[in-house]
Amino acid sequence: MKYLNLLILCLIVNLSFGQTSNWQKWQPIEKSHSLRIKTTKAEYYSLDLKGLKNQISNAPEAKDRDVIAPILSLPMPGGKMIDFNVISSSALAPGLASKYSEIKSYIIKAINDERVQGRIDVTYQGFHAMIQKGADLVFIDPALDKNTINYIVYKKTDLVRTNNFACLVNDESEKESLNFDSNDIRVSDNNFRTYRIAISCTGEYAQFHGGTKEMVVSAMNTTINRVNFVYEHDFAVRFEIVDKNDTLIYLNPSTDPYDNNDVGTQLDENQNQCDEKIGSANYDIGHIFSTGGGGLAGYAVVCKNNRKAGGGTGSGSPVNDAFDIDYVAHEIGHQMSGSHTQNNNCNRDDSASFEPGSASTIMGYAGICAPDVQQHSDAYFHGHNILEMGNYIVNGTGNSCPSKTILPGTKPVINTTSGNHIIPKLTPFEMEASATSEYPLLYWWDQYDNEVAEVQPPLPSNKLGPLFRSYDAVPSGIRTFPKIEYIVNNSLNTWESLSAVARDINFVVTVREDITDGARHSQAFDKLTVDANKGPFLVNNPNDKNVT
C-alpha cells in the first residue's frame, strides 16, 4: 500500500475488456514524483492484473490457427481503447517456463487493423506491452517499483533519456563477406530460426529488479520478448531463454563473479560461466546484463564456441525501451554481425556509416553522439544491417546452430527498375518500388552512401556521405525526398538535404512481409545522379501552403 499512497487518484473510469463482460477496470491516476519511467507526456492507469491473466490464459499458439484467440482491450495515448487478438509466444524454454509458470509472453494483433501489433507479457513484475501503431511505438509499463497495479502508457517519442550509453565492438576482423551480387541478394530464405540464448546478470542488476530469481527472470523475459518483436519482423529470428538460465542469475553483488562496471572483463567471465553452468552445446548466444559499464559485444560470434557468450549490456536503469531496444537489441545485433551505421565520428564503422548524424535505427547511436537525429532508436534495422546480418544468418556461421522451421509461401519478389536516374540540383524527388507476395508488404528506402560526410547535419554542398535519414517501413513503395509536408510548406528538414552539387546518390529498398511471427524480406538497389548544371526545379505559381 505504501506505493499506492504515492499516487493521487484523480479520475475513475470503468472500461470493459473483451466482448462479453466488464469485469476488468482501468483507472487513470495522477502522475507521481516517484515514477520508474520518465516521460514528457503520458497517461496513468490501474489494472486488475488477475482478471487480465484469467482473460488471456487460454491464448492459442501461432501454430494453432483454428483456435479462437481471446480478445484484450488496451489503452492507447489519448485514451482510446483498441481490441487485440492474443496469441501465446513464450520467450522461455519449456523447462524454464514450467519452473516460472507465472511468466507468460504473447503476440497481439489489433482486430480492426492487423498492422497495429506488438508484444505483451505477464510476469512476477506485472504487465508490459509494446505496440507498433503506424509510426508510433506505444508502451505500457509498471509505473512504480514492486507494484503490479499502477501503469504508465506512453509513446516512445515522449520517453526522456536518463543516462548516457557507450557501445564498443570487439574484433571486427570477424566480418564475413557478403556472398551475393547486386542482382541476386539472398539474405532471407524460407526458414524461421530460433536461437537459444543464455542470459547472466550481475548482482547489481538482480537487486535493481527485486533481488529474487522470479523477479530477475521476469525482467529478462520482458526484454527478450521485446527484442523478439524486432528480430522476428526483420530477420524471421527469435531468441528463447535456455533451460537452467536461472543458474546464471547472481543475486548478491558481493559474491557474483563479475565487475559490474567493467563490461570488458564481464565478457570473458561470462563465456566461462555460460559454458560451465549451461554447457557449450546447450546455447547458441550468451549475453550479460548489468547496471553499469555500457555495452560491448564480439562481432559475429553467434554459433561460435568459446566466443558466443561475448556480449553485454549495462545501464543504470535497465528497464523499458531505452534498455531493451536501444541497447540490448543493438548489442545482440553486433553478435549477429551488425555494424554501427552512424556517420558521426563516435565509434563510426567506415564500411557501414550510411546514416547521417547519430543515426535513427537500432545499430546507430541515437541520442548519444551529437548531432542527434533523435533521442532514441526506431525499432528496426537499416537496410545495410538487413543485408549484412541476413547474410550471416542465412549464408554464414549464424546458420550453423539455430533450430529451423519452414515458413509457408515464398519471400517477396521486387519488381523495380534500377538505373541511373538524373535529376536537377535542389529538386525534390521520389523513389518507387513494387513487389508481389501472398502477404501484405511494407517498404523502406535507405540511402546507401557510406563515405564520411563533410558536414553533419548534412548540407546541400556535401559531396560525400548520407544526405537522408532513414524512416520506418510503410505500405507504399514510394518515398518522397524530403517528406511531402516539407515540400508543401516550403520548409527544410534538417536530416533530409537535397543536393546542390554534382554527385551520385545510391539507395537500397527493403521489402518485408507485414506479419508478426516470422517475416521475410527482399532488397534491391537503385541510384540517381544530380546534375548541378540544371535546376532547381521550382513551382512558382501557385505558391500557397494551402494548395495541394
Where are these regions (language model features)?
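Proline/serine/threonine-rich low-complexity linkers at boundaries of modular beta-sandwich domains
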Residues: 393-413, 527-536
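Short, solvent-exposed loop/turn segments at the edges of extracellular beta-sandwich modules
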Residues: 511-519
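Solvent-exposed loop segments of extracellular immunoglobulin-like
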Residues: 436-446
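Fold-level signature of zinc-dependent metallopeptidase catalytic domains
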Residues: 18-37, 149-297
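The catalytic-center signature of Zn2+-dependent metalloproteases
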Residues: 242-265, 303-379, 451-455
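A short beta-strand segment in extracellular, disulfide-stabilized domains
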Residues: 422-435, 548
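Exoplasmic/lumenal beta-rich domain surfaces
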Residues: 240, 444-501
